[in-house]
Swiss-Prot record:
Its EC number is 6.3.2.6. It comes from Candida albicans. It catalyses: 5-amino-1-(5-phospho-D-ribosyl)imidazole-4-carboxylate + L-aspartate + ATP = (2S)-2-[5-amino-1-(5-phospho-beta-D-ribosyl)imidazole-4-carboxamido]succinate + ADP + phosphate + 2 H(+). GO terms for cellular component: cytoplasm. InterPro entries: SAICAR_synt/ADE2_N, SAICAR_synth, SAICAR_synthetase_CS. This is Phosphoribosylaminoimidazole-succinocarboxamide synthase. The keyword ATP-binding applies. Signal peptide: none annotated. Disulfide bonds: none annotated.
Amino acid sequence: MTSTNLEGTFPLIARGKVRDIYQVDDNTLLFVATDRISAYDVIMANGIPNKGKILTKLSEFWFAFLPIDNHLIKGDIFEKYPQLEKYRDQLEGRSLLVRKLKLIPLEVIVRGYITGSGWKEYTKSKTVHGIPIGDVVESQQITPIFTPSTKAEQGEHDENITKEQADKIVGKELCDRIEKIAIDLYTKARDYAATKGIIIADTKFEFGLDGDKIVLVDEVLTPDSSRFWSAAKYKLGQSQESYDKQFLRDWLTANGVAGKDGVAMPEDIAVQTKQKYVEAYENLTGEKWQD
């Protein structure tokens, strides 16, 4: 399911790369994770079956696991809003009722391993995103670093920025708090995932404000927002076996269509990408996935 239509029951206020967002009331939003998938900032023409449900369940797992206030409103949406019952086939298993908060306008990225272009930069200058990194000998693992980016509008590209630039966008005091919280959350998740045979190479968090309290929002530590690697098959300085959409990125690159609009994935690529997401869910939660 790549789009939703609640026929005006609640107004659709945003349609992102993956989520359709409806306004329930002045203080409440309904997030619906569709099966859309994007790579290189472009949405594919077709989706990954039940991907939105996997993202939703995994986000719920991490919201419960991580020691920070989040935007979730607990309870059955169909009991709270009986008018949604007729849209159960669109909403069940892929919807989150959340508090409407003031969003912090940063993509909060934490990197614990040197990946991709970062590895190329490191081998030249021993820096990652301009941040000095010491010697990395036996692995690409580093002390986690905060590498923010801008939050681009739909169809635009996020832009990597420095901590100092982020300070100017949100204020240094708030940015310092965000950096510490994000690195602490990443570290807790990284250490847990390591016990499940998964390396979290990097991840993207998003935060909102409830007064001056920083609140975790959006999706959390999913294959869409993170790089998950197999610890057992890890190889220094090489392309890693991953449980995320790197598989799709690799296919797009190999076929010369990375970043092009309107590209449809062959069925086998969609199936194999879904399997990566299922493996991430099962390994991290210890639960068997059921469509």
